[in-house]
Amino acid sequence: MLLIPAIDLKEGRCVRLKQGLMEEATVFSDSPADTALHWFEQGARRLHLVDLNGAFAGVPQNLPAIKDILAAVAKDIPVQLGGGMRDLKTIGQYLDLGLNDVIIGTAAVKNPDLVREACKAFPGRIIVGLDAKDGMAAIDGWATVTGHHVIDLAKRFEDDGVNSIIYTDIGRDGMMSGVNIDATVKLAQSVRIPVIASGGLTGLDDIPALCAAEKHGVAGAITGRAIYEGSIDFAQAQQLADSLD
């Protein structure tokens, strides 16, 4: 079970949001590159970046911070980025910087053809991020809940060639209320590609249940607020997950 630290970028700084609200941002660091190095030194084997300004603006907005992070750690561990990835040109430009994968979120739901085209242009390097409230996909920084069920979308994107799905339960992200294991497993069982859980990890007690879900296709979990606020020691959590595999 891979635990993946999240680095959320807002105006060049590392922050965390509560339930996707930009006005509910807590600043954790003015140096995202130092944050990336810290998590690498704590045993992270992959990093998850989100350009929050990009997610709201529709185009990435934190290029200097992203470049600094890649310069610091990309030679050692893969780095993935989401937020503002809404056309092939942007996706290509950011992959060329040294990112391992790009995550398409809102654009995947609004413009499914983009996913198909991106998978053809950049095979093996496209992840789709599906955010859900009560099983229905949410878009535009969680501002709009659609009529599309995430399982139907996941099956479609699997056929298009995405390498994995990141699944966020909106009701739990940044609220420290536990991962929605049941919903994540249900999604993972509906596809053959790996599903990464995101949102709600609260403590070491969550790790055994996550690891038990691995046999159903849940390959990892993204963690943010818990490791920044100290309710989870990242190194200890990854060691525990490794011991349970």
From Swiss-Prot:
CDD domains xref list: HisA
GO cellular component: cytoplasm
Reactions it catalyzes: 1-(5-phospho-beta-D-ribosyl)-5-[(5-phospho-beta-D-ribosylamino)methylideneamino]imidazole-4-carboxamide = 5-[(5-phospho-1-deoxy-D-ribulos-1-ylimino)methylamino]-1-(5-phospho-beta-D-ribosyl)imidazole-4-carboxamide
Protein family (similarity comment): Belongs to the HisA/HisF family.
Subcellular location per the Swiss-Prot or TrEMBL entry: Cytoplasm
Organism from which the protein derives: Neisseria gonorrhoeae (strain NCCP11945)
Listed GO biological process terms: L-histidine biosynthetic process; L-tryptophan biosynthetic process
Residues the record marks as active site: 8 (proton acceptor), 131 (proton donor)
Family matches, as Gene3D superfamilies: Aldolase class I
Stated name of the protein: 1-(5-phosphoribosyl)-5-[(5-phosphoribosylamino)methylideneamino] imidazole-4-carboxamide isomerase
